[in-house]
Amino acid sequence: MAVAVCHFRLGPEVWNTASMEMPKVKQDMPPPGGYGPIDYKRNLPRRGLSGYSMLAIGIGTLVYGHWSIMKWNRERRRLQIEDFEARIALMPLFQAETDRRTLQMLRENLEEEAIIMKDVPDWKVGESVFHTTRWVPPLIGELYGLRTTEETIHANYGFMWYT
């Protein structure tokens, strides 16, 4: 057996108990004079800064960034000039060291050439192959011809950490 559940409750003014008719529903009516105006526009609160203030902040950021870049470029240029001056001052020392190392290697090569070619008649140790009286800087192969392969590779390619 099903039990009916009433989802709404009608008051005694609506329920007519004498005739047991269908209840009459009281209809709500607007108040006298009608309802007031309804505000239907979107009313969102302001969020964040205004456009002008964001534009001002953006321009200020750009100006500050430009100023800091200019300042750093001036400092970098000053440091670069200092490095160039130090390099120019040390260049004669480096050139003298390179010349000393080259002459030492040429002397060692001449000694090795004298040992290797001692049995060859009419061989002049240290004779120039260029037939000139001017100084010609020796080539890498000429300097490192009698050296080990590792020394030649190091002279040609410099320091290689992966070998």
From Swiss-Prot:
Cellular location(s): Mitochondrion inner membrane; Nucleus
Chain segments annotated as transmembrane: 48-70
Pfam family membership, one: GRIM-19
InterPro entries, A to Z: GRIM-19
Lipid bilayer topology: Single-pass membrane protein
Major location category of this protein: mitochondrion
GO annotation (BP), single: negative regulation of DNA-templated transcription
Keyword annotations from UniProtKB, A to Z: Electron transport, Membrane, Mitochondrion, Mitochondrion inner membrane, Nucleus, Respiratory chain, Transmembrane, Transmembrane helix, Transport
One GO cellular component term noted in the UniProt record for this chain: mitochondrion
Family statement: Belongs to the complex I NDUFA13 subunit family.
Role of this protein: Accessory subunit of the mitochondrial membrane respiratory chain NADH dehydrogenase (Complex I), that is believed not to be involved in catalysis. Complex I functions in the transfer of electrons from NADH to the respiratory chain. The immediate electron acceptor for the enzyme is believed to be ubiquinone. Involved in the interferon/all-trans-retinoic acid (IFN/RA) induced cell death. This apoptotic activity is inhibited by interaction with viral IRF1. Prevents the transactivation of STAT3 target genes.
Quaternary structure (record): Complex I is composed of 45 different subunits. Interacts with CARD15, but not with CARD4. Interacts with STAT3, but not with STAT1, STAT2 and STAT5A. Interacts with OLFM4.
Protein name stated in the entry: NADH dehydrogenase [ubiquinone] 1 alpha subcomplex subunit 13
Organism the protein comes from: Macaca fascicularis (Crab-eating macaque)
Gene name linked to the record: NDUFA13
